Amino acid sequence: MSGALKTPFYDLHKRLGGKLVNYANYLLPISYPSQTHIESHLHVRSKAGIFDVSHMLQHRLVGAEASKFLESLVPTDIGAVKPGSCHLSTFLNDKGGVVDDTIITKVGENEIYFVSNGATSDKISAYITAALNEFQNGSHGLKYDNFKKSLVAIQGPTAHLHLSKALKTDLSKIFFGNHFFLENGEKVI
């Protein structure tokens, strides 16, 4: 595991006794001493679970042609997606084959946030950059960046109750496929 990177939650995983393995060149927990794999799975399916996904590559695309550009890479009609909505999609190669999957969030008419797999960060980054250079040809003014920051996934039928309490925020109007962002502890929609 030498050389593997640590997420911002590494110390917490260690303190909680997480069994860490190298995944996508990050030290991530696959289990904790309080539950077996099956117990953990059943707990998430019946209640809730939280996962450190900080190893995943996050992307931000801003500009008037953001939807048009992303539509050249995925089979999703981004223009028809309402701001505030999220969609599971796939990046496609020139022949229509799947390069990787992604979750796309339309933040606003001219801003798109999406997340791709951590294990394919270099491949996806190069794929998007090459496509953007070809698309832009110096005339579209799109701004693109990708980054790895703290990111957690909270799943399960009672996840919203726990998250509402922790954030002191009413999540009753945030339904499946909707989003909100927290920046410096403040809710940004």
Could you tell me what each predicted segment is?
Residues 1-189:
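Glycine/proline-enriched, intrinsically flexible loops and inter-domain linkers
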